[in-house]
Amino acid sequence: MMMQRTQLLLPLAMEATMLAQQQRGMATLKMISIRLKSVKNIQKITQSMKMVSAAKYARAERDLKAARPYGIGAQQFFEKTEIQPDEKAEPKKLLIAVTSDRGLCGAVHTGVARLIRGELAQDEANTKVFCVGDKSRAILSRLYGKNILMVANEVGRLPPTFLDASKIANEVLQTGYDYTEGKIVYNRFKSVVSYQCSTLPIFSGSTVEKSEKLAVYDSLDSDVVKSYLEFSLASLIFYTMKEGACSEQSSRMTAMDNASKNAGEMIDKLTLTFNRTRQAVITRELIEIISGAAALT
């Protein structure tokens, strides 16, 4: 009686096992197919973003060539006047972080934030940060939120203009923070595949007025110094924003190109896995058919 029951249940158990294996194989194929479709869609997005970044990079590079005289002229003014911070005054430092509101561009914004974190670690109590772009604020606010003086948003969606730089320079001067020295921290464009995190010195109006080389001009009053200081600060910010925009677009273009290549490699691996899994399912089904036919004969 037990043998008869075993003989009756064994085919049912084998059939249930084969059915479960078949369903598991089909479920695996469906999961691979869904993932493959998702990766292909991501690759289309990254390829499109690469093309957009390439077009924006070409324009940013042209704009940078036109903006460099602004930065060079302002730098020469500070170099030739040999302005030095007042050692007797209480040391107060201002750091202007030039980034943007947009991501997906490698370590462009992280490099600027890393350099500023190093400055803050040395003298946190006497250092304030003016963030140009929301990315620098997001990174620095985790540890040094109280040191952020002000944030300029809506940066990076459109190419920076001198009007944008003038507004930022005016906000810097209107903050009421009487700094003795400062730096503009930005990314200096070198080539399509490289950039360097650099700094440019800036000084307050009181520090500039105390320069010995400027003191020889009798007609140089505080209003003239203030006007030129506003223009030179706007010129430096404009120049650094153009350098940062060009570095950002080239880095985003490279990042999207790498992402597209990685997606292509993943598509190849998933396609191979899909074909192997499908072949295994087909082979298993053929074995089941042949085994069933052999059992009937």
Curated annotation (Swiss-Prot):
Q: Write down the Gene3D superfamilies for this protein, in alphabetical order.
A: 3.40.1380.10, ATP synthase, gamma subunit, helix hairpin domain (1.10.287.80)
The primary location reported for this protein is mitochondrion
- Subcellular location as annotated: Mitochondrion; Mitochondrion inner membrane
A matching Pfam family: ATP-synt
**Example of a GO MF term:** proton-transporting ATP synthase activity, rotational mechanism
Kindly give the InterPro entries that the UniProt entry links to this protein: ATP_synth_F1_ATPase_gsu (IPR035968), ATP_synth_F1_gsu (IPR000131), ATP_synth_F1_gsu_CS (IPR023632)
Give me any GO biological process, just one.
proton motive force-driven ATP synthesis
This protein's UniProt keywords: ATP synthesis, CF(1), Hydrogen ion transport, Ion transport, Membrane, Mitochondrion, Mitochondrion inner membrane, Transit peptide, Transport
Q: Which domain of life is it from?
A: Eukaryota
Indicate yes or no for the key word Mitochondrion: yes
> Belongs to which family?
Belongs to the ATPase gamma chain family.
Q: How does it assemble?
A: F-type ATPases have 2 components, CF(1) - the catalytic core - and CF(0) - the membrane proton channel. CF(1) has five subunits: alpha(3), beta(3), gamma(1), delta(1), epsilon(1). CF(0) has three main subunits: a, b and c.
Q: What is this protein called?
A: ATP synthase subunit gamma, mitochondrial
